[in-house]
Amino acid sequence: LIVSSSGGIKNVVVSIVGIKKGKKWGIPKKFSYDQNGCRFVPHVLLVRPKSKGVVLNSDNVGHNFHTVSKGVYNINKKIKANAKMKVKKKKIKKAGIIRVKCDLHSWMGGWWVAAKTPYTELSDESGKFSISDIPPGKYKLKIWQEKLGEVVQDLVIKAGEAQNITIKMK
């Protein structure tokens, strides 16, 4: 859990649920994820369903790339030192949370979050995030953090108004 001096939490996934159409995806169709210094970088990665990418191993030792999810993307494959593995778009089937681990190095852990909507962002080092181009309406704000779990709260967006939202997680 990475908490800033102001109490903000890094790597919180924030999504607005219930918007039927609107802005284009900000999350790229292609991604890159690295194993570097026996850590997954970045620790939390936002991906799009049916996206594709590459998993790198920048370390001088081999790793085991193992994902666990509820039908989103599951793989268990060794990656040699200084090698890469392609992720095909058909593999990330749907939106959901994907736990990433290395069975050879138990301290290595990370997360992929396959976003359901383009209205999804990841909080920065200070715990801040920004979601733009939200049409006026009533929605659900869905917040997820790996240790603190999930929180859902109501959100009302009025035309032409920016909102500052404080989310409390326990």
Could you tell me what each predicted segment is?
Residues 1-170:
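Extracytoplasmic copper-binding redox domains, predominantly the cupredoxin/blue-copper superfamily
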